[in-house]
């Protein structure tokens, strides 16, 4: 009897502590967490962006989720600017997570690394990308060549139903492949497609709140099947990627000429390794393991997100046929059909730019942004004190569907980004590439690919639904948010 009373008392105390957990710790309000698991099962992975938007309506632009550690969600535009941008250094950390340690066995890469040499690695990558002309004229030529091949492939379909995804995998994947390895792959080679399949297997459960339970309770990995954590599938795909990159590195090392200017990221990194080894100065992480994981990061980031945006673009296009007519007229009037579109044409294509910005707004790829953590104590985060190491989600996606900024936010309307004179308005409230110190390294490249591939396909084809009705705008949400598979038809203009 006494034991039962003690159990009941413990449960009552725990529920009381959970009920007032945020207030007791001086954290922003939020839904009441459950003992041990927090709010994990209140934010299902396939609806996490929608649930966060509902919590925003209830608790405001900053609130706390326990996943299972207390995690501060910032989802108001002005709050994001004040904290993630203006105080970016304090919010630029990455927490140690079970999933990253499982995937790369240490603190490596560019996007999820958190150690003393992260800044040096990011600076080096930015410098090499600039010297290689990433996102500049040379890249434009590469995209133009790949786009011509894409047009030929679609031409060969002869008005048959097309699933754009495998075609886009080849051309988009080849752009980052050229910068990383120094060459492009042919249509009959499968390496890029194999990587694409594997990275999607890795990402399927990458940001799942259930996976974050493993940060607190690693032994839950043994309950993979009942919890649907997907660990065996994730590790198999990850191991295949690492093995393939190791083989590519070994092959690359046999042919590199250290006396020549680097023609790829791998060349540049290996050359830097050699220089630093000669000077006995490897403290900034210039190792083969770092090179492999950095290429892993850049390859995956420079591929699937761009493919998803382009798929969203054509999904919204066939669902809004009046937009296609206006884009065709604008292209014909300002570019014509005799030459390829170039980046300088943007200033003459305001409606096309507005259309793509509306795609970025409604077709956001990350349902929830990757975890950050505070590197220092933050004395005033919207009236709350955050200790160093506090987990933070900068949920800029919520701004995209905020009525305060975008009236009728669920409606696809490119005209919202045109002024009264029909001029395009670049709106920094639409932020598909993150913000602050952890913003996307390849934003310029991604925007270039989306613009040039989209405009080339619009310049050459009329796009039609495959059947009497347009495909529904349905999404599949895991670590990424993408349209469900759909087909369209293309006819030569």
Swiss-Prot record:
<feature type="transmembrane region" description="Helical">
    <location>
        <begin position="60"/>
        <end position="80"/>
    </location>
</feature>
<dbReference type="GO" id="GO:0006082">
    <property type="term" value="P:organic acid metabolic process"/>
</dbReference>
<feature type="binding site" description="axial binding residue">
    <location>
        <position position="440"/>
    </location>
    <ligand>
        <name>heme</name>
    </ligand>
</feature>
<feature type="transmembrane region" description="Helical">
    <location>
        <begin position="290"/>
        <end position="310"/>
    </location>
</feature>
<keyword id="KW-0479">Metal-binding</keyword>
<dbReference type="GO" id="GO:0020037">
    <property type="term" value="F:heme binding"/>
</dbReference>
<feature type="transmembrane region" description="Helical">
    <location>
        <begin position="1"/>
        <end position="21"/>
    </location>
</feature>
<keyword id="KW-0560">Oxidoreductase</keyword>
<dbReference type="InterPro" id="IPR017972">
    <property type="entry name" value="Cyt_P450_CS"/>
</dbReference>
<keyword id="KW-0349">Heme</keyword>
<dbReference type="GO" id="GO:0043231">
    <property type="term" value="C:intracellular membrane-bounded organelle"/>
</dbReference>
<comment type="function">
    <text>Cytochromes P450 are a group of heme-thiolate monooxygenases. They oxidize a variety of structurally unrelated compounds, including steroids, fatty acids, and xenobiotics.</text>
</comment>
<dbReference type="InterPro" id="IPR036396">
    <property type="entry name" value="Cyt_P450_sf"/>
</dbReference>
<dbReference type="GO" id="GO:0006805">
    <property type="term" value="P:xenobiotic metabolic process"/>
</dbReference>
<protein>
    <recommendedName>
        <fullName>Probable cytochrome P450 CYP36A1</fullName>
        <ecNumber>1.14.-.-</ecNumber>
    </recommendedName>
</protein>
<keyword id="KW-0408">Iron</keyword>
<dbReference type="InterPro" id="IPR050182">
    <property type="entry name" value="Cytochrome_P450_fam2"/>
</dbReference>
<dbReference type="InterPro" id="IPR002401">
    <property type="entry name" value="Cyt_P450_E_grp-I"/>
</dbReference>
<keyword id="KW-0503">Monooxygenase</keyword>
<dbReference type="GO" id="GO:0016712">
    <property type="term" value="F:oxidoreductase activity, acting on paired donors, with incorporation or reduction of molecular oxygen, reduced flavin or flavoprotein as one donor, and incorporation of one atom of oxygen"/>
</dbReference>
<dbReference type="InterPro" id="IPR001128">
    <property type="entry name" value="Cyt_P450"/>
</dbReference>
<dbReference type="GO" id="GO:0016020">
    <property type="term" value="C:membrane"/>
</dbReference>
<dbReference type="GO" id="GO:0005737">
    <property type="term" value="C:cytoplasm"/>
</dbReference>
<keyword id="KW-0812">Transmembrane</keyword>
<dbReference type="GO" id="GO:0005506">
    <property type="term" value="F:iron ion binding"/>
</dbReference>
<keyword id="KW-0472">Membrane</keyword>
<keyword id="KW-1133">Transmembrane helix</keyword>
<dbReference type="Pfam" id="PF00067">
    <property type="entry name" value="p450"/>
</dbReference>
<comment type="similarity">
    <text>Belongs to the cytochrome P450 family.</text>
</comment>
């Amino acid at each position: 009897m006494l034991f039962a009373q003690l159990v009941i008392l413990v449960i009552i105390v725990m529920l009381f502590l959970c009920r007032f957990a945020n207030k007791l710790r001086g954290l922003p309000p939020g839904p009441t967490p459950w003992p041990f698991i927090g709010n994990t099962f209140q934010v299902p992975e396939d609806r996490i962006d929608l649930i966060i938007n509902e919590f925003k309506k209830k608790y405001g632009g900053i609130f706390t989720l326990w996943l299972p550690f207390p995690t501060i969600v910032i989802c108001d535009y002005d709050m994001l600017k004040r904290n993630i941008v203006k105080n970016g250094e304090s919010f630029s950390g990455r927490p140690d997570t079970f999933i990253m340690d499982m995937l790369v066995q240490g603190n490596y890469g560019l996007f999820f690394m958190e150690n003393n040499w992260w800044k040096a690695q990011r600076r080096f990558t930015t410098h090499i990308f600039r010297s290689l002309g990433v996102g500049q004229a040379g890249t434009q030529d590469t995209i133009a060549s790949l786009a011509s091949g894409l047009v030929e492939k679609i031409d060969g379909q002869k008005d048959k139903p097309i699933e754009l995804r495998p075609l886009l995998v080849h051309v988009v994947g080849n752009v980052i492949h050229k910068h990383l390895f120094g060459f492009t792959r042919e249509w009959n080679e499968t390496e890029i497609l194999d990587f694409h399949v594997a990275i999607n297997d890795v990402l399927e459960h990458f940001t799942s709140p259930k996976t974050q339970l493993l940060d607190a309770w690693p032994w839950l990995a043994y309950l993979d099947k009942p919890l649907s954590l997907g660990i065996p599938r994730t590790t198999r795909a990850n191991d295949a990627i690492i093995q393939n990159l190791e083989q590519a590195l070994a092959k690359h090392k046999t042919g590199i000429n250290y006396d020549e200017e680097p023609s790829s990221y791998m060349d540049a990194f290996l050359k830097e390794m050699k220089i630093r080894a000669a000077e006995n100065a490897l403290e900034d992480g210039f190792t083969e393991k770092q090179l492999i994981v950095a290429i892993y990061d850049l390859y995956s980031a420079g591929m699937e997100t761009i493919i998803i945006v382009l798929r969203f673009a054509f999904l919204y296009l066939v669902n809004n046929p009046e937009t296609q007519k206006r884009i065709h007229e604008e292209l014909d009037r300002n570019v014509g059909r005799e030459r390829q579109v170039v980046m300088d044409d943007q200033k003459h294509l305001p409606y096309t730019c507005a259309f793509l910005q509306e795609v970025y707004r409604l077709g956001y790829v990350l349902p929830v942004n990757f975890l950050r953590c505070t590197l220092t104590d933050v004395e005033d985060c919207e009236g709350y004190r955050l200790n160093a190491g506090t987990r933070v989600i900068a949920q800029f996606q919520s701004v995209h569907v905020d009525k305060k900024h975008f009236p009728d936010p669920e409606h696809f309307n490119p005209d919202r980004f045109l002024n009264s004179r029909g001029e395009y308005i670049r709106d920094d409230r639409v932020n598909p590439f993150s913000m602050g110190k952890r913003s996307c390294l390849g934003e310029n490249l991604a925007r270039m690919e989306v613009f040039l591939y989209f405009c080339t396909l619009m310049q050459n084809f009329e796009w039609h639904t495959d059947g009497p009705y347009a495909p529904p705008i349905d999404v599949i949400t895991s670590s990424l948010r993408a349209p469900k598979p759909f087909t369209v038809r293309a006819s030569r203009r």
